[in-house]
Amino acid sequence: MIEIQFYNSLSGRKEKFSPSDPNRVTVYSCGPTVYNFAHIGNLRAFLFVDVLRRSLKLLGYGVDMTMNITDIDDKIIRDSIASKKSIIEFTAPWTKAFFEDLKTVSAEILEHYPKATDSIPEMVDIIQKLQKKGLVYEKDESLYFSIQKFQNYGKLSKIDTSGMKTGTRYDTDEYEKEDVRDFVLWKSPKLEGETSWYTLVGTGRPGWHLECSAMIRKVYGSGVDIHTGGVDLLFPHHENEIAQSEGAFPEESFVKTWLHSEHLLVDGQKMSKSKGNFYTLRDLIQQGLDPKAIRFLLISTHYRSKLNFSTDRIAEASANIRKIQNCLDRILELEPDIKADFYFLFSIPFVQTWKKEFEESLADDLNISKALAVVFESVKQINSLLDTNQSDSKQRIEYIQILAYFDRILGVLNFESKKDLLDSEIDSLIEERQIARKNKDFARSDAIRDQLLAQGILIEDTKEGIRWRKK
């Protein structure tokens, strides 16, 4: 087990990670609101959770991880009523799409995916405890949290509530840090057909912020070692989670370490449907982009740095995967009978060094950029050793093992011996590429080119037309 340093948003500095039980690190991550397809900004946050999970396991920790499904909120209420469907009918296909997207980008399945609507009793219990402590008031049959009565409000976002006017409040789930007000815990129904529950705290439905506090309590009984989410959730959502949970259960530790992933930009700008730069995973795949390249790009920048998504960056990600895969394929051609039962025991000193440096990079607040530098340096050295025939079978198998070790985080490599394409398959792909170029579908054209290059096929434009040859 390797010591980890995480940047804790609560303290604003890197800290030694000290879970309650290293064999069962508890992690809660804010998941999707299932009213539409997740966009690639959401996907970056979900893949950050995947890298966190894979890294904890690789560094020797046991994990027990949760990502919630928000299946009741303002947007879902609005759209379900408009579509004349029940909440369950409306959210079911979007929930299914979320899991399909996770599978497409090779995200590992977590232990728990609770739905908000399955935790109503826990929400009611939290409200009742807050009421007993005088932290709740009622207005127009809805219940609100009085933040001025909670001494530690603002400790995560460092917000100053001293200038707040008493009794100002928000019914909406999302608002800006500059306009802090009391937030709603339980909403009375306002619209015809609005989903409601009949409970001891009244008829209505939960506010968004209450849902995560309740699901954490339902899954884990108390608090967690790590809570993650996008930086946009730090305020008000996570600040309000702290207020609710610590207000109701002041004797318990709610969250030890807060980790927040930064925004994703598209061509240097914030994603916006009006700007035409708003993409879902399915949009990108329909354009011919490789899901592995999308995954690689989204995990390749440190989670606390903004990531710029562009076609150039996708092409770069494809090239980087190809660089690693080509190295692996060279070894597999020499060792075609190797089985995929990797044991990760290394005897070669420089391979041991690669492993150690890779682990140390991840243990330093998931420094993926530094970890990737180790990967590419190892690929460079392996290729050099193969070029000069300086490796025997035992050593080559160890090279495969270290690439597999790296792929425990990357999740983009294929360890099956390369199957050569038939000539007819190559001709068919080249014809498809020509059609794509004619239609100015350059993303698909480039994807086919990359696929052929990965198979060792070079395309040449000649006066007589397109020719291809094997490297």
From Swiss-Prot:
List the InterPro entries: Cys-tRNA-ligase (IPR015803), Cys-tRNA-synt_Ia_DALR (IPR015273), Cys-tRNA/MSH_ligase (IPR024909), CysS_C (IPR056411), Rossmann-like_a/b/a_fold (IPR014729), tRNA-synt_1_cat_dom (IPR032678), tRNAsynth_Ia_anticodon-bd (IPR009080)
Instruction: Report the residue ranges where the short sequence motif 'KMSKS' region is annotated in this entry.
Output: 270-274
Is Electron transport a UniProt keyword of this protein?
Answer: no
Which reaction(s) are listed as its catalytic activity?
tRNA(Cys) + L-cysteine + ATP = L-cysteinyl-tRNA(Cys) + AMP + diphosphate
**Carries keyword ATP-binding?**
yes
- Spell out the GO cellular component terms annotated for this protein, sorted alphabetically and separated by semicolons: cytosol
Q: Which cofactors does it use?
A: Zn(2+)
Q: Where does Zn(2+) bind?
A: C30, C212, H237, E241
- Where does it localize? Cytoplasm
Cofactor comment in the record?
Binds 1 zinc ion per subunit.
Q: Which residues bind ATP?
A: K273
Q: Which key words are in the record?
A: Aminoacyl-tRNA synthetase, ATP-binding, Cytoplasm, Ligase, Metal-binding, Nucleotide-binding, Protein biosynthesis, Zinc
- Spell out the SUPFAM superfamilies in the cross-references: Anticodon-binding domain of a subclass of class I aminoacyl-tRNA synthetases (SSF47323), Nucleotidylyl transferase (SSF52374)
What quaternary arrangement does the UniProt entry report?
Monomer.
Annotated protein name in UniProt: Cysteine--tRNA ligase
Protein source organism: Leptospira interrogans serogroup Icterohaemorrhagiae serovar copenhageni (strain Fiocruz L1-130)
Encoding gene per record: cysS
